Amino acid sequence: MEIKKLTNLHGELTVPGDKSISHRAVMFGSLAKGTTKITHFLEGADCLSTISCFRKMGIDIENNSGEILVHGKGLHGLSVPADILDVGNSGTTTRLISGILAGQNFVSELTGDDSIQSRPMKRIMTPLLSMGADIASIKGNNCVPLRIIGHPLKAIHYDSPVASAQVKSCVLLAGMYSDGITSVTEPVLSRNHTEIMLNYFGAQVTSEGTTASIAPEPSLFAREITVPGDISSAAYFIAAGLLVPGSEILLKNVGINPTRDGLLRVCKDMGADITLLNVNMEGEPTADLLVRTSSLHGTTVGGEIIPTLIDEIPMIAVMAAFAEGTTVIKDAKELKVKESDRILVMAENLSRMGADITPTEDGMIIHGGKPLHGAEIDSYLDHRVAMSFAVAGLLCDGPLSIKGGDCVKISYPEFYEDLYRLGE
């Protein structure tokens, strides 16, 4: 995939539906009684893996061009899988569905692609085992493939060593099949889509500080869900609008959940001109984002804000390379166990373009403001890396090519078309 320099990006754009919310809508709709209608569903490869897994467990799911009908069968309505459950590249599918499968009355196996088979699953296996679950890594390396022998579980309180919405969600979902109140405490609050949506479906989930708790055996009932635009997908257009000279972009109906809005706060710290319009704070908060070209400067990103922007750090790193001054990103060791080691991959590729960047154990230091040139970028099949460097390619001197650039289909199949449409 080759990217060329552009100026004057203008127009309106509705980014795809939020990936985290799309996953959960299908999962919880499958466990609810009745038909759940989901509009603006993200039809990326990861979310389609979730649909595939629940279809294999007997759930009828209709897909009508982004409108999904999930004919749920209730909390105990899943059937023995017709085949091994293939999660593809999706960590969310793997970790959340494991919590559900642990409480079923059947045996299941999860597999996935090479990338997911290298990502850490001990972080969910540990709490599930303490609930009495029978879950094992088939290769004995605490990774996928996993074998889960479902049975009733015992309630626990789990102190999670990491702020991870996937770990928290896994434990809460398993807690629905337990014998009492199950709770999870995190060191820092992670995204809370599971808590919001489970309550919407009828579960009893309470949150206090960084602790979330769920009562067992909830009766979940079908709902209608409109998925907001994914702020992680909007991030690339926010960055492009800020960096590309002469630009003004309106991004419609973007999710601005406070557990996900760290990117907006960092952009403001860097001097960004971003205006929130049509703000709606009911349920999952949303707003239209008006983004104008800005002169950015370096900042420090670390501490409690990290879980609210962990997926946006590759894009922030690119922004920092074009901003004046030094940006320090720290407390982000989680980047090392994403689809790629995003610390090393961002440092390697930005260095190829002439950026002054030093990787650290938990982040990176970027001395910005140097002119960057085109290069051959290796995405390592990481969709967020590919999209971040596509934005960089709009600004650098000379063409930039992205090896494995098609991996954007994981979360944003029409990404390149949308990007160039704004430059027409």
Feature map (PLM): residue ranges:
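Structural preference for solvent-exposed beta-strand-turn elements
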Residues: 1-424
